[in-house]
Swiss-Prot record:
GO process annotations (BP): cell morphogenesis; cell wall organization; lipid A biosynthetic process; peptidoglycan biosynthetic process; regulation of cell shape; UDP-N-acetylglucosamine biosynthetic process
Subcellular location: Cytoplasm
Entry EC no(s): 2.7.7.23, 2.3.1.157
Region (Linker): 226-246
Protein name: Bifunctional protein GlmU
Chain positions recorded as acetyl-CoA binding sites: 375, 381-382, 400, 418, 435
Similarity comment text for this entry: In the N-terminal section; belongs to the N-acetylglucosamine-1-phosphate uridyltransferase family. In the C-terminal section; belongs to the transferase hexapeptide repeat family.
PANTHER family cross-referenced by the UniProt entry: BIFUNCTIONAL PROTEIN GLMU (PTHR43584:SF3), NUCLEOTIDYL TRANSFERASE (PTHR43584)
């Protein structure tokens, strides 16, 4: 099967410089969500109908995607016609879908396709029952057979009473679709070519059926930032519900933002106002407290993180972090490390049991087991041109307000006096102090 994804619309009501389909619905571009859903059907080629600022869509999807261009906006039928060169010699099925319905479920598309195949139909439309169907195309049927779809502006009073509406998703046999597209015209109030006219053309001598959705929210389109927020909320609720059903504790799901790819182990508690993004994994029995943001990181079991930011890092069992710590990319905290308030790490490994309680920067560093980093310690890793590494051994005590000017090595079991500026390697089992002599001048202030 091939698909045709309608993604050429300007999205005027979005009031944005971006094409509508690249806006993020719960952290992922809408067009990516549509393609992800279609991949469930083992689609051999997704053909995108692009128009307004198509280069922005290609930036998201890559230039190797299959697409055609609709230069003029002359209706949905005109859009699909642009894809005829890509399907005219194809003998399979073609699925047509709007690019702005990110709530469509994978299982819905599977059931939709299976009904089409089981009924040996020539075409099928996805429909839904709306109590207030205003503005939607109405599905006109004779028993189970679909006769036509009538747009709101073209419908008579009797047709407007029909509550079954067109959801904008179709499957047709490719050759039947191509022949029908050649017959559609723009003799209607809007002067546009409607893809829905294909239904009436095919129904004259072929079998066209419908599949009615149980959850009409799946076809919620996005035409404004308000509707974008609505679908994002639904997607967030789906993710949070699935996590809770798997044993995760969400104190307040309404204020918890967790991307689709995030994995969380059972009995982990997520507090309000937490954001978990990208390919983040969190183990079991951990606590992620309010104000925390974790991106593309792996968090093990029994970890406690409070009001901190963690990016592209690894946090092993029993670690405590925060409040107000920042783990920048390539930080690796091993078992039972403690990182306190206003501590920043970057491209550093802290071995088992290391403690850095407060006001510290550890960049391009390796710190051995059970070392204590005093308040105000800074690894001076950058000379204005290059980055250098600081190596600190195990069981080291770094006094407060110490500057470690890289490259520098501190040996095991060493002690660095508070206020020191260390520029030379310190051997193991040593005391190193580097600071000016304290001078006292009595009676200085008269």
């Amino acid at each position: 099967m091939k698909s045709i994804i309608m993604a050429a619309g300007k999205g005027t009501r979005m009031k944005s410089d971006l094409p509508k389909v690249v806006h993020l619905a719960h952290g992922k571009p809408m067009i990516v969500r549509i393609i992800d859903a279609l991949n469930t059907l083992d689609v051999e080629e997704n053909i995108l109908i692009l128009g307004h600022k198509r280069e922005k869509v290609l930036e998201v999807l890559g230039n190797d995607v299959s697409y055609v261009v609709q230069e003029e906006q002359l209706g949905t039928g005109h859009a699909v016609k642009q894809a005829i060169p890509k399907i005219k010699d194809y003998d399979g099925d073609v699925l047509i879908i709007n690019g702005d319905i990110p709530l469509i479920r994978k299982q819905t598309l599977i059931d939709f396709y299976n009904l089409y195949k089981n009924e040996n139909a020539d075409g099928i439309i996805l429909s839904a029952i709306f109590e207030n169907p205003f503005s939607y195309g109405r599905v006109i049927k004779d028993g189970n057979k679909v006769l036509r779809i009538v747009e709101e502006k073209e419908a008579n009073e009797e047709q407007k009473k029909v509550k079954e509406i067109n959801a904008g998703v179709y499957i047709f046999k490719a050759q039947a679709l191509v022949k029908a597209l050649e017959k559609i015209n723009n003799n209607n109030e809007k002067g546009e070519y409607y893809i829905t006219d294909v239904i009436e053309i095919l129904s004259n001598d072929k079998k066209v059926i419908s599949y009615s959705l149980e959850d009409s929210m799946e076809i919620q389109g996005v035409n404004s930032k308000v509707e974008l927020a609505l679908v994002s909320k639904v997607l967030r609720e789906r993710k949070n519900t699935a996590l809770m059903e798997d044993g995760v504790i969400l104190i307040d799901p309404a204020t918890t933002y967790i991307d689709d790819e995030v994995k969380i182990g059972r009995d982990t508690t997520i507090y309000p106002n937490v954001t978990l993004q990208g390919n983040t994994e969190i183990g079991e029995n951990s606590e992620i407290l309010s104000g925390t943001r974790i991106i593309d990181s792996k968090i093990y079991d029994n970890v406690r993180i409070e009001s901190s930011v963690i990016e592209e890092s690894i946090v092993e069992n029993g670690v405590t972090i925060g409040p107000y710590a920042h783990l920048r990319p390539k930080s690796h905290l091993k078992e039972n490390v403690h990182i306190g308030n206003f501590v920043e790490t970057k491209k550093s490994t802290l071995e088992k049991g290391v403690k850095a309680g407060h006001l510290t920067y550890l960049g391009d560093a390796h710190i051995g087991e059970k070392t204590n980093i005093g308040a105000g310690t800074i690894t001076c890793n950058y000379d204005g041109k290059n980055k250098f590494k600081t190596e600190i051994g195990k069981d080291v005590f770094i006094g407060s307000d110490t500057m470690l000017v890289a490259p520098v090595n501190i040996g095991d079991n060493s002690l660095i006096g508070a206020g020191s500026v260390i520029t030379k390697d310190v051997p193991s089992d040593s005391l190193s102090v580097e600071r000016s002599k304290q001078i006292i001048k009595e009676g200085w202030k008269k």
